[in-house]
Amino acid sequence: MAGERIFLDTWFIHALLNARDSYHAQAKALLPRVRSAAQVVSTEAIIIETCNGLAKYNRAGASAFVRACYADPRFEIVPVSRRLLDVALEHFSNAADKEWGLTDCISFAVMRELGLHLAATGDHHFRQAGFVSLLDAPPESR
């Protein structure tokens, strides 16, 4: 929807670019909403995780997607600075009762800093952290 600010997670990008992914259709259905957002944000950690995960299934698509993100003026890819990593490591260390990965914690830190609430993801970790997941997926997925 116009005016929205959306965080883009690996979960969504993988589902979108891997036709064999069980959430591919859901990701494709969400894509117009992402495209019409006023701002889309992700991180270098998400970009790296995405390319690594898609290297076997859609290397060319992953490369093209990343290049398109960098070329789009509405898209911001936040670098993983030492300060951001320190904040994320603190979240990671303090979340022993969760299964959050470091990339999740980097995402959560960026979302909090930028005042983002919506995430293009089906990852239940985002809901656990208090954000809105734009894709419905059972907690045990991925």
Identify the meaning behind each predicted range.
Residues 1-5, 108, 114-142:
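Acidic, PIN/NYN-like endoribonuclease modules and their adjacent C-terminal/linker elements
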Residues 44-46, 104, 123-124:
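Short secondary-structure boundary segments
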Residues 69-81, 89, 95-97, 126-142:
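Short acidic, glycine/proline-enriched helix-loop-strand junctions
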